[in-house]
Swiss-Prot record:
Its EC number is 1.1.-.-. The gene is arp2. NADP(+) binds at I24, D70, N97, R130, Y160, K164, V193, S195. It holds the Pfam family adh_short_C2. This is Hydroxynaphthalene reductase arp2. Keywords: Endosome, NADP, Oxidoreductase. Hydroxynaphthalene reductase; part of the gene cluster that mediates the biosynthesis of dihydroxynaphthalene (DHN)-melanin, a bluish-green pigment and a structural component of the conidial wall. The first step of the pathway is the production of the heptaketide naphtopyrone YWA1 by the polyketide synthase alb1 though condensation of acetyl-CoA with malonyl-CoA. The naphtopyrone YWA1 is then converted to the pentaketide 1,3,6,8-tetrahydroxynaphthalene (1,3,6,8-THN) by the heptaketide hydrolyase ayg1 though chain-length shortening. The active site is at S146 (proton donor), S147 (proton donor), Y160 (proton acceptor), K164 (lowers pka of active site tyr). It comes from Aspergillus fumigatus (strain ATCC MYA-4609 / CBS 101355 / FGSC A1100 / Af293) (Neosartorya fumigata). GO terms for molecular function: tetrahydroxynaphthalene reductase activity.
Amino acid sequence: MVNTCTYLPLSGKVALVTGGGRGIGAGIALELARRGASVAINYGHSAKSAQEVVEAIQAIGRQAVAIQADLTCVPNIESLIQEVVRHFGRLDIVVSNSGMEKFKPLEETTLEDFNEVFNLNTRAQMFVARYAYDHIQPGGRVILMSSIAAGLGVPGHALYAGSKAAIEGFTRCLAADFGRKGCTVNAIAPAGVKSDMWRENAWRYAPGCDKSSSLEEIETALASGSPLKRCGVPEDIGKVVSFLASPDAEWVNGEFFSPPPCKGPLPGGDLEC
């Protein structure tokens, strides 16, 4: 059964979701569409899954298009946003979701590793906002993507955590910049969301688990620290984004949201809630 929404606060709006072809990005794109938005789905390499998201959106009667662009190349970001405006005629909502995760021992970390992570997780988000500013409609919304990892001390995770920590500073300053156009800028810091990235690295955060642990064991360990006793799914983040993109959030600006109820492993192995 197709899941549709009769409340359409985003009807007539156009959204761009970077990294929207899979995982959290796909969940965000679908939730925006369920609330009436037309959606441009940017992807880097996942053409097949991006097209599947497009088809799922079209199946509920919304418009969607998939656009390939490597956001580690800054000129591609400007071209992407221009293409969205050419295709739909406007731009109202920008969700900067593209990102990558890397674990590497400090003693093995190179400049190439640094550039690889920061070029996508940090620089690209800055320039998505920069070029969105030129085209976004008055009253528009920009939502950046951080991570709860920015506030945790996980071995071998300094590059990822640092690249996401910068987003909080971006958010507060960009909120002031975009305020001149009547637009808001907020950020989300997810954790424990079941996606392809989660499947690869969740064992590193799960108390009592290691690389040999099954996904069921990892999920049980992580969910046990949540008052809701479950891990998040991409649609959970999509619903938070949809709220921030809606008229109800017009007085929410420069804020940093961490939807999951727990903050991760403490030195003793317990989860901080």
